[in-house]
Amino acid sequence: MRFSCGRVQHHFLFLLLCATTLSCGRGGSAESRLGLGGIDVRGNPNNVLSAIVGVQLTNAATVRVEYSSDPAQDAGSTPDFEVKNSRMDVPVLGLMPESNYSLQVVATGTDGTVVKGDPISFQTGSLPNDIPSFVVVQTGDVQPGYTMLGCIVFAPQNPAVIVDQTGRVVWYRENPRTVSDFQKQPDGTYTVAVNNSDLALYSYFLSQYQQYDNLGNLLRTWSATGGWLTDDHELRLLPNGDALLLAFKQKMMDLTAIGGRPDAIVVGNLLQRLAPSGDVQFQWDAFDHLPVAGISAPVDIRGAYVDWTHANAIDVTSDGNYLLSIRDLSQVIKIDSTSGAVLWKLGGFNSDFEFIGDSWNGFSMQHGVRQLPNGNILLFDNGDGHEPPQSRAVEYQLDFVNRRATLAWEYRAPRSLYAAAMGFAQRLENGNTLIAYGFAQPVRVQEVNASGQVVWDLRSTSGTFAVYRAFRIASLY
């Protein structure tokens, strides 16, 4: 029997199996027997590629759902979920569109016994028309997992999507507003920056961050505190529940000394660490720590509005301080997480390091800084100021004694993949690097090995849009 997406099928079943029947002689009282019943399946209004299986459990430690499609194109299982309540909803993610599935609940008891429910049917729906499509060419060993893409499409519905290694969309969450930064946070939730206004400040969208569970249900929102406008470039959730995010600050300044206007509106950034309540735990103000004279070519300083800092990435270092990528200064800085002092500057105006072994003598208009486990710094160098412009992923080893930044690794993309804006580089567990080329057209994301060979190459096959970043994750759950 087939059921359309969203229709609820009640499969009332109650199985009470004595533990001895599955555990080779283990005894068990009636009160300790494993049981399941009241099974139903329903569609997910946020995502037709998923289902929600409800089940009533007795004396169960874990529960999962095994699934297979008909015809046999797709089969798998959810993880084993810890049973915390007698009634559980189990998410089933990453299904194929327009497919009939057989779903089976599998429960494991506290004593190791196992019981399975009867198979139930579920029919997935059709993907929305505005979900982009992709193709992949794989030519080598890749890091297993899924790839997250924040798609900036400027359409009635703007999707954050996740694709598998073949390029098939396996998860999405649409939004009527433009989206950008899309990440899976350490607690397993997803966050996405959403434009929440029809207005813009200079070239920025005024945004908020939405936090979802893996079914795309909205859990909460995050915004800058203190009346400041929220920047859409990055949100990082910390293990203690705090959030790091960026905000905008405007200040009228006389820039005639550097070729600007006497009444320029200069746009800078704040970095805030917020408690879950929204209370500010830490705030850093670029105007208090950096000179406006450090603005980097090709930024135009002659207009009424001057996009001064354009911070676009945050990372927490191994010693608990903060890295901040400041695009319009072509600079990465390290900030003391207690005092706010700038501990060092890499690149740009008054850099504390000399570049060694880098024929481009540093990076230009970069995105996505990260500290690697070995202490090195990895970033996506957009290369707007290189001659000619060219993008790359680049890694530097920092020598704090001699103040040198030595090129440890780079991958210079073909000039056809030059990304004037956006982009990201992520070092993967297998040593490869995932590179998103931002505004390059058509959309491209590549996995490159340590030797500089492209082993996985994704490109869009539908329309003109941009991908702000890409992240490889191990699981949808």
Regions found by a protein language model. Give the residues of each.
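Short, amphipathic alpha-helical segments
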Residues: 27-28, 190
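Short, surface-exposed linear motifs at loops/turns and structural transition points
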Residues: 28-127
